[in-house]
Amino acid sequence: TLPVVRDGSLEGVITIGDIAKTYMDVYDSMILSKARTQYRNIARAVDGEVITGNEHSYLLNGKVVIAASSRILMSDFISRDDLVIMGDRKDAQQCAVDMEASCMVVCQNASISEEIIKQAEKKQIVIIRTPRDTFTAAQHINQSIPVKYFMTKTNLVTFKMKDYVDDVKISRLLTETGNY
């Protein structure tokens, strides 16, 4: 268990189990938006660089999708505000722009045309380019979720420096929580 501190004040605690959830909860394609994940954190998690867009803004809506289908199929599953992981296919990049995705993660340092970049800028779409392949980017993207999303913030059991060890032991035995 590790304390999460801001300006000298305890905000919460995080456990190995909490961290493991970021790897286990892979079936929730909305998790990045639920966690209000910042685009610069996404770029860091995939070892990427922000090509255009506000890296300080957040993914607030939308799901994470991989553009691996035909444009017709992609038009059916990509929605406005989604984060789309893709490769070098120009039609996939254009589809993400046309569907007004909030973010495009372009893998394997694939080229992005100036026209796509201009359209993305106009629609305030963040474009991140990464050297990682699509599989690796998709695996690592959950590592961008802020600690505050997984940490325990309530029902914390705390002690002060002047508390006696015997009292701490008794308290630990009487409570079943790991929120210390």
Please identify what each model-predicted range represents.
Residues T1-A20, D81-D82, E100-C103, D166-Y180:
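Helix-loop-beta junctions that constitute the ligand-sensing/allosteric loops
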Residues R6, R36, R40, R44, ...:
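Arginine residue identity/basic-tract feature
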Residues I16-A68, H140-T158, I170:
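Tandem CBS (Bateman) regulatory domains
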Residues A20, K90, A110, D163-V165:
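Residues that cap or initiate secondary-structure elements
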Residues I66-T154:
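Feature captures the catalytic cores and cofactor-binding loops of soluble hydro-lyases/lyases
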Residues I72-L73, F77-I78, A92-Q94, F159-G178:
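Active-site/ligand-binding-proximal alpha/beta "capping" segment
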